[in-house]
Amino acid sequence: MAVPFRRTSKTAKRKRRTHFKLSVPGMVTCPNCGEAKLSHRVCKACGQYKGKEVVSK
């Protein structure tokens, strides 16, 4: 098996990992009830999506 010729420095390792990060979910407020919800998804509090009741509460 191949083995690295030189040890990877802290800087090189950290530069490689700059793109390895978590992304923040797209949160918006529900226009019906004002609760925070994920965009393009049904509101968990009132059950509405795009002004229509999808889930009966």
Curated annotation (Swiss-Prot):
SUPFAM superfamilies membership: Zn-binding ribosomal proteins (SSF57829)
Pfam families named among the record's database cross-references: Ribosomal_L32p
GO terms, molecular function: structural constituent of ribosome
InterPro entries: Ribosomal_bL32, Ribosomal_bL32_bact, Ribosomal_zn-bd
This protein's GO CC annotations: large ribosomal subunit
GO biological process: translation
Keyword vocabulary terms for this entry: Ribonucleoprotein, Ribosomal protein
Highest taxon, organism lineage: Bacteria
HAMAP family attached to this UniProt entry: Ribosomal_bL32
Family statement: Belongs to the bacterial ribosomal protein bL32 family.
Name used for this protein in its record: Large ribosomal subunit protein bL32
Lineage: Bacteria, Bacillati, Bacillota, Bacilli, Bacillales
